[in-house]
Amino acid sequence: MPTMAEVARRAGVSVSTVSHVVNRTRFVSPEKAQLINDAIAAMGYQPNELARSLKVASTNSVGLAISAISNPYFTDIICAVEAECARLGLMVFLSDTQEDPDRELQVVRAFHQRRVDGVILAPSGSPERAIAYLADKKLPCVLIDRFADDRFDQIGVENETAMRALIDHVASFGHRRIGYIAGQPGLATTRERVDAFHASLAANGLECLPHYVSPENVDTASATASTHAILSLPAPPTALVTGNNMTTIGAVRAIREKGLSIPRDLSLVGFDDFEWADCFEPRLTLVEQPCTEIGRQAATLLSERIASSHAPPRAVRLKATLQARESCARPVNRRSI
């Protein structure tokens, strides 16, 4: 365990300055405080007085760690968390972990060092170390969107029900060859949606062909490449389902690069309705997730967890809504698109 003196050396300040920042006993310039807090987070320094007492004075602040702020899906969630926390009298510290497990661990450590009352976390694909740290420090936490650990309160959508609605919709047009472009590897939501895709096909009496499924796509570019590969098969699917908004964009790009028309040549549906989905031609059929409600309830759950740390963890699943638009039509039998 690093010492306060080692933190001081790394930050290039005196031990007393580090002590003032840790104990909040004297004003320290923001520049020096940032150097010290960065050193504390990087070294994993744990103040002895905090370790001796789990009950420190409330700071009326919470940390919000988002795995990819650039993803439009999280915009409404962030706004709702901040609005509800403001109503509850809580300040929100926001950080982007950039889907990086190392940065994720650094962020939750920094939140703890700043003595936030709790954390709302949208986990990365490999959140084990960050979650273990939160559990070890007994820091109240709510996981959003990605169900990763049953030791914490969690909130997300009913992925199985939403996928069933998508497949039922596509099958109602007569499609029997349906492909799937899944989302990021390692995420519980990705696994749930892949499993639900298989189950929903079976429920409709349809066969799931392995070469019609791209189970892991890290970004829009990989979704574009996966869509190209599936559409180049000798007997490609007549409809595609996408696992999130990024894979939807990648699929649309590949379809257009192939010179194909939606839905004349290929039907397309997917997860994550987004604000400019109406700007596509045709307008896309997508599952709308209740992002505002996810954010609001996440803040409420955390506030209740802070007030009652011994209550059993809760898992909340919210219903998503199918927004049926114009991107589905009856299938056209094609070979080697």
Label for each model-derived stretch:
Residues 68-71, 98-99, 125, 183-188:
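Short histidine/acidic/glycine/proline-rich micro-motifs that form metal-
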Residues 98-101, 122-127, 246:
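Short beta->alpha connector loops
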Residues 45-118, 195-198, 209:
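Amphipathic helical "hinge" segments at domain boundaries
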Residues 28, 73-74, 103, 151, ...:
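Secondary-structure boundary/capping motif
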Residues 15-20, 54-70, 169, 177-184:
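Short beta-strand segments enriched in small/hydrophobic residues
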Residues 6, 24, 100, 158-159, ...:
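Acidic/polar helix N-cap motif
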Residues 1-60, 73:
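N-terminal helix-turn-helix DNA-binding module of bacterial transcription factors
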Residues 1, 15, 42, 80-88, ...:
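Bacterial carbohydrate/catabolite-sensing allosteric modules
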